[in-house]
C-alpha cells in the first residue's frame, strides 16, 4: 500500500543488515501488543508458503491464486526467479495485522502491507476489496523481487541498494502492480504541469515530490519509450552501484537531463488536451509559472466540502452519497 510507514520499513530493514548491533533483528515483535492468539496454517503453492488462520481460509486460497498470478507476471518482466520459496503471511483484517510479531514494531493504521528484508517475508491484511488485496500483493511481491535481485538478506548484498532513492523503488512497485495508466497519478501530474512544478532529476528525492506517484510516472515513461525490459536491467545496475543516474545513462546512452526533459514534454503534451477542453491555460514561461504557483486555491472553483468558518476542518477520502 502507498504509505510512508511501509517505505520506512522496506528500506530501514535493509539498512539494519549493515548495522553493528544485531539486537533489532533478534527481537522482532517483542513490543507488539497481542490481544488474540492466531493459530496459523500453511497453504503451499508452487512458489509460496501462505500463512493464514481459520477465519480467512477461503480468502487465503484466493490470495494464493493472486500471488501465483503476480509471480508469473513479475518474473517475466524482471527476467528472474526468486531464490527459495516466498513466505506470504496473511491477516484477516487490519486490527489483526497490527498485532503481528513478524516486524520490529506494530504497523500503523495506514500501512497496507510490508516486505521485510531479513527473511523476505511479505505481511499484509486482506483489503476491503479484491482489487485492493490484489494490488498490495503485487506491490509487495515486487519488493521481494527487488531484494532478491540485489542480494539483500544474503552475504552478497548489493552494496548500493541503500542508496537507491524511494522514487525508484516504490515507483517501480507501483508501475508494475498498477500499470502505466493510473487516474490517481495522472491527477498529480496534471496539477504539477498546471503549476509549472515538474522536478529536475536531482529534485525527485525531495520530500516535496511523493515517491509513489512521481516514481510511477517516471517508470511509465521509461517503459513506454524503452520497453519493460529496461526495468530489470536498471534495477540490477543500480543495485550493484547505488548510482541510478549512471545506470540510466549507460542503459539509454543519453544524459539524464535529456531523458527528464523528454519526460516533462510528454507530461505537458498529455495534459494539453484536457487543459484545452476545460479552459485551463498552461504556463509557458517563468512569469506564468510563478503566477501559477501563487494562484490561490479558490480561483480554481468554489469550495464544495469545507464552508466558511470551518477552516480548521478537513476531509479524508470524501465520497458522493448514492442517494444524494
Whereabouts are the PLM-identified features?
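Cleavable N-terminal signal peptides
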Residues: 12-13, 22-23, 177
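Bacterial N-terminal signal peptides that target proteins for export
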Residues: 1-10
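Short coil/turn segments at secondary-structure boundaries
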Residues: 150-152, 189, 278-279
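N-terminal signal peptide c-region/cleavage motif recognized by signal peptidases
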Residues: 18-20
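Beta/coil-rich, acidic/histidine-enriched accessory regions frequently appended to metallopeptidases
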Residues: 27-44, 206-210, 233-324
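Juxtacatalytic substrate-recognition/specificity segment
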Residues: 25-165, 182-184, 202-204, 244-247
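Active-site-proximal alpha-helical
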Residues: 50, 74, 167-183, 190-257
